[in-house]
């Protein structure tokens, strides 16, 4: 069983591509950051502007592991899926899948950490934790 999945789409832009006309691999990490930012601003109700500028907190990436499965090309429409694999005291494990035209292109796991003004990990605030919980994959 699984929890909710956050899904969004984005078209591959010219700036995303290398001279071979395929997505330059570091651009996927920028795209993932955008997906996380959209997830926070949307269903989690806490935009990065609010977190960073008003609350003085952030959610940096502590770890990421990626698998490049098939190339994506200019003007491909990509579908991004995000699910939560683990919700710790201050950390959150994410699973990302990128597909286009029914073909898996990229997948990654990522760990983000809730960090306070001191730049040290702090527990997720309960209201935010409660909004993350529905995205948690249920383990059998």
Cite the ranges covered by each PLM segment:
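Hydrophobic beta-strand-centered segment that forms part of the acyl-chain substrate-binding groove
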Residues: 40-86, 106-107
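HotDog/MaoC-like acyl-thioester-processing domains
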Residues: 3, 68-74, 85-140
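Short aromatic/hydrophobic contact patches that present stacked aromatics
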Residues: 11, 65, 111
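Hot-dog-fold acyl-thioester-processing enzymes
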Residues: 2-61, 117-140
């Amino acid at each position: 069983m699984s929890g909710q999945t956050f899904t969004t789409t984005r078209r591959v832009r010219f700036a995303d591509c290398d001279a071979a006309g395929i997505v330059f691999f570091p651009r996927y990490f920028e795209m993932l950051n955008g997906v996380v930012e959209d997830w926070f601003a949307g269903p989690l109700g806490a935009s990065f502007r609010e977190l960073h500028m008003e609350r003085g907190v952030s959610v940096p990436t502590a770890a990421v592991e990626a698998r490049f499965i098939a190339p994506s090309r200019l003007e491909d429409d990509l579908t991004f899926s995000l699910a939560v694999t683990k919700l710790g005291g201050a950390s959150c494990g994410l699973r990302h899948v990128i597909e286009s035209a029914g073909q898996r292109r990229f997948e990654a796991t990522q760990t983000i950490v809730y960090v306070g003004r001191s730049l040290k990990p702090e527990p997720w605030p309960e209201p935010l934790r409660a909004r993350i919980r529905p995205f948690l994959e249920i383990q059998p």
